[in-house]
Amino acid sequence: GVLIDDDVIDFCNKECHNVVLSLDGRKEVHDRFRKDYAGHGSYDAIVPKFQEFVKKRGDKNYYMRGTYTHYNTDFTNDIFHMADLGFTELSMEPVVSKPTDPSALTAEDLPILKEQYEILAKEMIKRDREGRGFTFYHYMIDLTGGPCIYKRISGCGSGTEYMAVTPWGDLYPCHQFVGDPKYLM
């Protein structure tokens, strides 16, 4: 996100069917892991760029995707923060890490996480009734034609429909492979 400029926006809007932007939610949550090249949190630099990107994108697909960890098991607050910033296509997924990583989710986190999904559903209904609705990717359930039916048939799309771009420009078939040299494209 820190490298987004008008050229990147124009290219993505012309060439990319769907774009995924990484924002973990609230400033303190995002800045914990999302640093710039100098080691500073990137929230203040990227949020205005993402807002401009989405504004120029019009009705083309995008998702604002965050990651929740042991440090933000109250992740609905991060989703609501993103919605309050004006983003309407949202996704929030659990961290993928070694169990020994301090950010790893634990068995003790599960009751809190389950409760968060209930809170999310209720708030989505409330906001929709108020005319402030948003989409949460993982609640898009359509058993005959939802977004996951195609993934069940053809796989997740890693490296064909989806690629991860690191801040330094390296390409990987999936964000889960970033840093593993055998998957560097």
Locate each region found by the language model.
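Radical SAM enzyme [4Fe-4S]-AdoMet core and its adjacent flexible, acidic
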Residues: 28-47, 51, 55-168, 178-184
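Conserved SAM/AdoMet-binding glycine-rich loop
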Residues: 1-27
